[in-house]
Amino acid sequence: MKQQLLLLEDVEGLGRSGDIVTARPGYVRNYLLPKQKAVIAGAGTLRLQAKLKEERLLRAAADREESEKLAQILKDIVLEFQVRVDPDNNMYGSVTVSDIIAEAAKKNIVLTRKNFPHAHYAIKNLGKKSVPLKLKEDVTATLIVEVSSESSYVAVLNPQPSQEQTAAEELN
């Protein structure tokens, strides 16, 4: 038999803080109650529910504002990656979500895996790509990622003569 609960925190896939939800007894007993993410709903929890909903609304407004600011910042930023390629311009490996998060951190932008709706997203081709992001409070943003080949490999393919080689050729 399912139990009615008052959520104290947002629980993904179940509800948000202040919501009264039903959940299976094992989930309640083994996860929600021990981690203090919920309490069993009763007559005395109505005041707590009102307080939690008010706090959630304030937090949601702040999160939405913060997410919209971040979306505006991300609109103007291009993350650039230099990767090794073979002579046919095929990449060795790929640019993964972890690489994008690390590069964004260098620019003081905090992203997590939760911001990427496609968790196994990987860029395997050269060029500019638009990466969709999901921020807090259902705000979406697009991050531009530009992947280009390393200049050192291009130099190996098209070697520039050194000054010594140029001088030797002029003497001949």
From Swiss-Prot:
Keywords: Ribonucleoprotein, Ribosomal protein, RNA-binding, rRNA-binding. One of its GO terms (biological process) is translation. The keyword Membrane does not apply. GO terms for molecular function: rRNA binding; structural constituent of ribosome. GO terms for cellular component: ribonucleoprotein complex; ribosome. Binds to the 23S rRNA. Belongs to the bacterial ribosomal protein bL9 family. This is Large ribosomal subunit protein bL9. It comes from Chlamydia abortus (strain DSM 27085 / S26/3).
